[in-house]
C-alpha cells in the first residue's frame, strides 16, 4: 500500500508545482496588459517570468494580492548593480516604477507599506530602508478599469 501511495503523492506534488508555475506566468501576462502610469514601461523591461522576482505582496484573504512589488533582473541604464522595482496595483490594474531608476544593490532590503491620508483619503505607497523613508508614491485610481 505504501509503495503505491508514494508515486501518487509525487505525481500530485509535481502537478501542483506545474500549475503554480503556469499561474505565475499567467499573472505576468495579465500585469503586462495593465495601464503603465510612468516610464519605463513594464513590458519594455519584462518579457518573461525569469526577468522578474516578487519582492513584496499585500494580500487580501478574499480577493488575493492587492499590491505587489516586483523586482526585475534588468539594471537601469548607468547602474552597475540594482534593479527596476515596479508597484503593481492588482485592483486598479495599474503598474508603475517606484522611481524611474531605483539603483539599489541587491543586498539592500526595502520595507513597504500602504498609507491612507486621513484627510484626503488618498492612498500612498511608502518604501523605506532601515526605518528611513526613501520614497512615497501616490496610488491613483484607474478610470480605464471598468470592472
UniProtKB/Swiss-Prot annotation:
Membrane topology, from the record: Lipid-anchor
Q: Which organism is it from?
A: Escherichia coli (strain K12)
Q: Does the keyword GTP-binding apply?
A: no
Residues lipid-modified (S-diacylglycerol cysteine): 21
Impact of altering residue 60 to G? 5-fold decrease in degP induction when overexpressed
Q: Which family does it belong to?
A: To E.coli YfjS.
Stored InterPro entries = YfjS_YafY_dom
Gene Ontology CC terms, in alphabetical order: plasma membrane
Protein name in the entry? Lipoprotein YafY
Q: Any idea which UniProt keywords this protein has?
A: Cell inner membrane, Cell membrane, Lipoprotein, Membrane, Palmitate, Signal
Disulfides per UniProt: none
Its subcellular locations are: Cell inner membrane
Instruction: Spell out the Pfam families in the cross-references.
Output: YfjS_YafY
Amino acid at each position: 500500500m505504501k509503495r503505491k501511495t508514494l508515486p501518487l503523492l509525487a505525481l500530485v506534488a509535481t502537478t501542483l508545482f506545474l500549475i503554480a508555475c503556469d499561474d505565475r506566468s499567467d499573472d505576468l501576462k495579465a500585469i503586462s496588459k495593465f495601464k503603465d502610469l510612468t516610464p519605463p514601461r513594464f513590458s519594455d523591461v519584462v518579457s518573461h517570468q525569469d526577468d522578474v522576482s516578487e519582492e513584496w505582496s499585500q494580500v487580501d484573504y478574499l480577493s488575493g494580492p492587492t499590491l505587489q512589488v516586483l523586482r526585475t533582473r534588468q539594471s537601469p541604464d548607468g547602474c552597475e548593480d540594482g534593479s527596476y522595482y515596479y508597484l503593481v496595483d492588482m485592483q486598479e490594474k495599474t503598474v508603475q516604477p517606484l522611481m524611474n531608476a531605483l539603483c539599489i544593490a541587491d543586498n539592500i532590503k526595502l520595507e513597504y507599506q500602504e498609507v491612507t491620508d486621513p484627510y484626503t483619503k488618498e492612498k500612498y505607497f511608502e518604501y523605506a530602508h532601515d526605518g528611513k523613508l526613501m520614497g512615497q508614491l501616490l496610488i491613483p485610481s484607474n478610470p480605464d478599469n471598468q470592472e
